[in-house]
Amino acid sequence: MKILKLKEVMDCTALGRSTIYKYISEDTFPKPIPLGSRSVGWLQSEVEDWILARIAERDDSFA
């Protein structure tokens, strides 16, 4: 199990910080895990699952 910091999540998803937090507020992106008083991270597996779901949505729209 690996925890990703915000920059790594941004690199994996090609999304900006504000977009990631917008999707979190809309319950369409995995919620971060508190790591300390001013630090959060995301489970790599949850971010990867989110990416795979976007791919599945794309593929379903072409079917």
Predicted segments with their positions:
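Short Lys/Arg-enriched helix C-cap and helix-to-coil transition segments
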Residues: 33-38
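Polyanion-binding surface elements
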Residues: 1-19, 23, 46, 52-54
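C-terminal structural segments of small proteins and small subunits
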Residues: 39, 43-62
